[in-house]
């Protein structure tokens, strides 16, 4: 008998501190009007000093586990998608596993930048649907404020901190229908934080650098392709999509992708206005919001998609 993986709980967490566009006006040469016109972003959340990716992940995980109606001890796989880990090693997943009071089962990080949650969810699906895992915890958690050059108005206005999580369980009823992952390392310099450590010293800039126009054109192209790939694999049409939950990078990327796919705006979940770009956390944050406010309902087709530095990109098609 074929087995599938199904999302049975979602959770999220946003740091208390909110940084508005008006506050950014006093920090860097920008304006609320300029930011909103180009990105759609009104505000973003910023982690407190000493608040790490694992701390945000812990709160989101607790909410997802509670929503799933299980105990932390039932989790037998932890995957954390992050570009801003607590430390070089051990993995943030191992740190999170310990904070949850569990041990013994696999725990590891996935680093695919803003596609990280898509990569992590696809990986967990393979574990769960094959019987290698019963209940998987998948988390996207980021503290991008730590790698931000707050003097660079082209990047510092874009990003925020946060975490989102889901619990995936094995089921006879289809949940995740298919996943589709891609990468092209020839674009590795287009969007990066190119620092490295040699002999205890940081070489290169630890801050985000980005060629915005290249990112925009590439993102719209491959996000459309990733959704079409998922639809074709399941003999579905764009009209069959109940909800598109994209990576929340920029409102123009989101609306341009939806328009190319012929998906009306009212079927697109948008949180970038309030959260900014939270990288690997953006998709699970948006998913949790749409689940908790009742938009996502049983039996609906939900497409999750993301694109990030590398470039990496992908999609996951879910029957809720």
Swiss-Prot record:
Question: Do you know which Pfam families this protein is assigned to?
Answer: ACP_syn_III, ACP_syn_III_C
Q: Keywords, A to Z?
A: Acyltransferase, Cytoplasm, Fatty acid biosynthesis, Fatty acid metabolism, Lipid biosynthesis, Lipid metabolism, Multifunctional enzyme, Transferase
User: Which region ranges are annotated with the description ACP-binding?
Assistant: 248-252
Return the InterPro entries for the record: ACP_syn_III_C, ACP_syn_III_N, FabH, Thiolase-like
GO MF, one term, reads: 3-oxoacyl-[acyl-carrier-protein] synthase activity
Q: Which SUPFAM superfamilies match?
A: Thiolase-like
Annotated EC: 2.3.1.180
Q: In which pathway does it act?
A: Lipid metabolism; fatty acid biosynthesis
**Where along the chain is the active site annotated?**
114, 247, 277
Keyword Lipid metabolism: yes or no? yes
Q: Which reaction does it catalyse?
A: malonyl-[ACP] + acetyl-CoA + H(+) = 3-oxobutanoyl-[ACP] + CO2 + CoA
Give one GO biological process term.
fatty acid biosynthetic process
**Cellular component GO terms, alphabetically?**
cytoplasm
Cellular compartments annotated: Cytoplasm
Q: Which family does it belong to?
A: Belongs to the thiolase-like superfamily. FabH family.
Q: Quote the entry's note on domains.
A: The last Arg residue of the ACP-binding site is essential for the weak association between ACP/AcpP and FabH.
Assembly information from the UniProt record: Homodimer.
Query: What is the stated purpose of this protein?
Result: Catalyzes the condensation reaction of fatty acid synthesis by the addition to an acyl acceptor of two carbons from malonyl-ACP. Catalyzes the first condensation reaction which initiates fatty acid synthesis and may therefore play a role in governing the total rate of fatty acid production. Possesses both acetoacetyl-ACP synthase and acetyl transacylase activities. Its substrate specificity determines the biosynthesis of branched-chain and/or straight-chain of fatty acids.
Q: What is the official name of this protein in its record?
A: Beta-ketoacyl-[acyl-carrier-protein] synthase III
Originating organism: Nitrosomonas eutropha (strain DSM 101675 / C91 / Nm57)
């Amino acid at each position: 008998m074929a087995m599938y993986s199904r999302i049975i709980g979602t959770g999220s967490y946003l740091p208390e501190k909110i940084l508005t566009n008006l506050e950014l006006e006093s920090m860097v040469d920008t304006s609320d009007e300029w930011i909103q016109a180009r990105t759609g972003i009104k505000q973003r959340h910023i982690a407190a000093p000493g608040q790490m990716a694992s701390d945000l992940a812990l709160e989101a995980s607790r909410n997802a586990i509670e929503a799933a109606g299980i105990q932390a001890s039932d989790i037998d796989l932890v995957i954390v998608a992050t570009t801003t880990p607590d430390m070089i090693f051990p993995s943030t997943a191992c740190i999170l596993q310990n904070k949850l009071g569990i041990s013994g089962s696999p725990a590891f990080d996935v680093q695919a930048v803003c596609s990280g949650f898509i990569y992590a969810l696809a990986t967990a699906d393979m574990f769960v649907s094959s019987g290698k895992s019963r209940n998987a915890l998948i988390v996207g958690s980021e503290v991008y404020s730590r790698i931000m050059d707050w003097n660079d108005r082209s990047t510092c206005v874009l990003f925020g901190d946060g975490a989102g999580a889901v619990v995936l369980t094995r089921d006879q009823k289809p949940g995740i229908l298919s996943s589709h992952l891609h990468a092209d390392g020839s674009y590795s310099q287009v969007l990066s934080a190119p620092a490295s450590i040699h002999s205890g010293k940081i070489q290169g800039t630890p801050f985000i650098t980005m060629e915005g126009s290249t990112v925009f054109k590439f993102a719209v192209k491959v996000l459309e392709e990733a959704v079409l790939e998922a639809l074709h694999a399941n003999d579905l049409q764009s009209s069959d999509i109940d909800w598109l939950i994209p990576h929340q990078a920029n409102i123009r990327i989101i609306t341009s992708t939806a328009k190319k796919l012929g998906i009306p705006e009212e079927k697109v979940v948008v949180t970038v206005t309030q959260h900014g770009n939270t990288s690997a956390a953006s998709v699970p944050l948006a998913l949790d919001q749409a689940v908790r406010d009742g938009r996502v309902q049983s039996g609906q087709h939900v497409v999750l998609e993301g694109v990030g530095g590398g470039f990496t990109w992908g999609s996951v098609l879910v029957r809720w």
